[in-house]
């Protein structure tokens, strides 16, 4: 039987085609699946990692972006420890729909859930949403922020490891560990996080559009599923 100290449930949400599936597979399998199709309903993968000397099991749930699956995916919000809200930096409509996703999160998720805004596909050279706009949106809504590229593996491991570190800090804090706040502050001072709005966003340059009612997938050279 596998030994681990913590089990955390992380749920990815966002429009179809923003790259949710590719982020999950890049982190859990080290793969970028070209031509990845849309997620049907909900899928999940597990990865055990070591963070701050603790063995952590991450249960990562990949949800469909299509409207017809919404009632299914909403049921997974409430038990989530962290919610990653993903948009495509090269597709304005995926950013414009963020308020709709946030309303869902506020309605169905635990009020204390850790929320992270992720601008994916930074390998793309046709950026439509500047990094600063993403950062400002995250700060306005008390979310952490990071830009990633599942295709180039840019900031993908960092995203999940920092989430795990934050969740460990919360768990220790609940257990009365006085060092939790200090550890979190140290991570921030070392560039792990910038206040409550950012995981220290570091832009590079990644595609695929998809309205809130479209699909959950994305692609190869020019797109990342999700």
Enumerate the language-model features and the residues they cover.
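Switch II (G3) loop of P-loop NTPases
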Residues: 56-69
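Conserved alpha-helical scaffold flanking the Walker A/P-loop in AAA+ ATPase domains
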Residues: 45, 70-75
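Conserved beta-strand segments of the P-loop GTPase G domain that flank and frequently precede/overlap
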Residues: 60, 84-88, 117-120, 148
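Conserved Switch II/interswitch segment of TRAFAC-class P-loop GTPases
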Residues: 79-99, 109-113, 122-128
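Switch I (effector-binding) loop of TRAFAC-class P-loop GTPase G-domains
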Residues: 29-55
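Conserved P-loop small GTPase signature centered on TRAFAC-class small GTPases
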Residues: 1-17, 21, 55, 111-117, ...
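Alpha-helix C-terminal capping/helix-to-coil transition sites in glycosyltransferase folds
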Residues: 78-79, 140
């Amino acid at each position: 039987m596998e030994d681990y100290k913590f089990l955390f449930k992380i749920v990815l949400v966002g429009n179809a085609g923003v790259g949710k599936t590719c982020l999950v597979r890049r982190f859990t399998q080290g793969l970028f699946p070209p031509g990845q199709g849309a997620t049907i309903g909900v899928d999940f993968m597990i990865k055990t990692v070591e963070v701050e000397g603790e063995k952590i099991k991450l249960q990562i749930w990949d949800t469909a972006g299509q409207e017809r699956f919404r009632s299914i995916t909403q049921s997974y919000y409430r038990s989530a420890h962290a919610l990653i809200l993903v948009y495509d930096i090269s597709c304005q409509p995926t950013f414009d729909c963020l308020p709709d996703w946030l309303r869902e999160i506020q309605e169905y998720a635990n009020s204390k859930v850790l929320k992270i805004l992720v601008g994916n596909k930074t390998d793309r050279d046709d950026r439509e949403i500047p990094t600063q706009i993403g950062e400002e949106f995250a700060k306005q809504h008390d979310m952490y922020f990071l830009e990633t590229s599942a295709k180039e593996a840019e900031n993908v491991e960092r995203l999940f490891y920092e989430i795990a570190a934050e969740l460990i800090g919360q768990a220790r804090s609940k257990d009365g560990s006085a060092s939790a706040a200090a550890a979190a502050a140290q991570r921030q001072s070392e560039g792990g996080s910038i206040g409550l709005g950012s995981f220290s966003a570091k832009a590079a340059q990644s595609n695929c559009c998809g309205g809130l009612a479209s699909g959950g997938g994305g692609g190869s050279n020019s797109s990342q599923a999700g």
